[in-house]
Design a protein with these regions (language model features):
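N-terminal low-structure segments adjacent to metalloprotease catalytic domains
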Residues: 1-51
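Short histidine/acidic/glycine/proline-rich micro-motifs that form metal-
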Residues: 47, 139-141
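Auxiliary, metal-adjacent structural segments of Zn-dependent hydrolase domains
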Residues: 49-102, 161-170
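Flexible, glycine- and charge-enriched loops at secondary-structure boundaries
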Residues: 50, 120, 143
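A generic structural signal for well-ordered alpha-helical segments enriched in polar/charged residues
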Residues: 62-66, 132, 156
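Active-site scaffold of zinc-dependent metalloenzymes
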Residues: 81-120, 133-137, 146-157
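Short alpha-helical catalytic segment bearing the HExxH-like zincin motif
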Residues: 121-130
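Post-HExxH zinc-binding segment in Zn-dependent metallohydrolases
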Residues: 141-172
Length: 172
């Protein structure tokens, strides 16, 4: 399945889109060690501790970058999401391009109600922005498009980091 904007892409962009769409998982070595950071992130968000949220996000992204052998990147966690008529900005990936490293910016509060973003939404936003980094640095794509494969890669990382506790099976 291709998204509606696909038909507006140039032939070269369509090739990049198709390459991106074909990659659906990101195998994350030793994810178990990174899973230990997830409760810390959840707790820091619950406590509304921006500095701790940023520190845990940095550890998480540096750990993933190291395991995936891509350049490290900086993470900034900011207060209230920017918004306009187009909606709210959840996260932003800025490639290195002249900087020492790429930067992910995340906002931990919604624009309208200024509430702390739900934990899973916040984590997915972090992983979404990291996937842009992986498109450039791991997969060496010249551009990073939102494809079905892109969203599957984001989910792949999410499910490797979040091990949902399933209810106990009464038959076992």
């Amino acid at each position: 399945m291709v998204f509606s904007y696909y038909k507006k892409l140039s032939a070269a962009q369509k090739r990049i889109y198709e390459q991106s769409d074909a990659i659906i998982t990101v195998p994350l070595p030793d994810a178990g060690e990174l899973q230990l950071l997830i409760p810390l992130l959840s707790s820091a968000l619950t406590r509304e501790d921006r500095e701790q949220v940023e520190a845990v996000c940095r550890k998480l992204t540096l750990g993933m970058a190291d395991r995936l052998a891509v350049p490290p990147l900086r993470v900034k966690v900011l207060a209230i999401r920017p918004s306009a008529s187009w909606g709210e900005l959840h996260g932003l990936y800025e490639p290195a391009e002249g900087r020492a490293s790429a930067v992910i910016s995340l906002w931990m509060r919604t624009a309208k109600h200024r509430r702390v973003v739900a934990f899973k939404s916040f984590l997915r936003t972090l992983l979404h922005e990291l996937c842009h980094h992986l498109d450039y640095e791991l997969y060496k794509l010249p551009d990073s498009f939102h494809t079905e494969g892109f969203y599957k890669r984001e989910s792949s990382l999410f499910h490797q980091l979040i091990k949902e506790q399933l209810p106990a099976d009464p038959n076992k």
